[in-house]
Amino acid sequence: VLTEEDKARVRVAWVPVSKNAELYGAETLTRLFAAHPTTKTYFPHFDLSPGSNDLKVHGKKVIDALTEAVNNLDDVAGALSKLSDLHAQKLRVDPDNFQFLGLCLEVTIAAHSGGPLKPEVLLSVDKFLGQISKVLASRYR
């Protein structure tokens, strides 16, 4: 459960992410596909090379969806309800991949932070992304 302090930290940490959604999204997907190559199977029609337009467009969609969750931290499940249904019922994405994506996003955020992330910021962002993973995986029952 995110505390009020966690929510405040996530909102502050998210400002550069949301302002640079295409960049953060594409870099996160590039890291995901490099570290977890089996995730590529969900994108057979994409150009998965780093910096490709496909990664930029889809990466922006990912960050925009997460920004919606940041804007609704008191109802993340509601904010991601349609996305959760899509990934569970239509796309049938392995729910473990949501955790992998979250970890890759943490690395991307850290890489752009200009220095080490403060432990309390990393903890809050990690809790938020863990909550996202749980919400997205919740429709798999």
From Swiss-Prot:
Coiled coil: none
Assigned keywords, A-Z: Heme, Iron, Metal-binding, Oxygen transport, Transport
Domain of life: Eukaryota
Binding site for heme b: 87
UniProt record, GO biological process: hydrogen peroxide catabolic process
GO cellular component: blood microparticle; haptoglobin-hemoglobin complex; hemoglobin complex
Iron listed as a keyword: yes
Membrane-crossing segments per the record: none
Function text: Involved in oxygen transport from the lung to the various peripheral tissues.
Assembly with partners or alone: Heterotetramer of two alpha chains and two beta chains.
Family named by the database record: Belongs to the globin family.
Listed name of the protein: Hemoglobin subunit alpha
Organism (species): Microcephalophis gracilis (Graceful small-headed sea snake)
